């Protein structure tokens, strides 16, 4: 499984997890520039939630959350600012869903 396939599988799992927990998925893979993408935009109650999904096959090279660098976080924030400039949003937050596929499926939501 290449990284693109792993990432897409992780995003699918994250969407199912979020929906199961009361989130409504508004958009997926929203691109604002070559460097600026929001994996999932969802709504939970009255809050718009911007979700970054990090998926790893195993934890051999570290946990999924360790893949979020300052640069990546800055790009996520930039995407959020673009979205907010185009949409009326009163409440929002940024979440991260970390997924490890093996040895057993593990989904963590921060």
Predicted regions and their residues:
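Acidic-basic catalytic patches of nuclease active cores, encompassing PD-(D/E)XK
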Residues: 1-28
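Conserved catalytic cores of phosphodiester-cleaving nucleases, focusing on short active-site segments
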Residues: 38-59, 76
């Amino acid at each position: 499984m290449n990284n693109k396939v792993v990432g897409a599988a992780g995003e699918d799992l994250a969407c199912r997890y979020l929906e199961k927990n009361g989130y409504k998925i508004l958009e997926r893979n929203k691109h604002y520039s070559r460097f600026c993408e929001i994996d999932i935009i969802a709504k939970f109650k009255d809050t718009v939630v911007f979700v970054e999904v990090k998926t790893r096959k195993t934890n051999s090279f570290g946990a999924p959350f360790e893949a979020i660098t300052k640069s990546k976080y800055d790009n996520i924030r930039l995407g959020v600012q673009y979205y907010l400039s185009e949409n009326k949003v009163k409440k929002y937050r940024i979440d991260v869903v970390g997924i490890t596929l093996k040895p057993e499926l593990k989904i963590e939501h921060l």
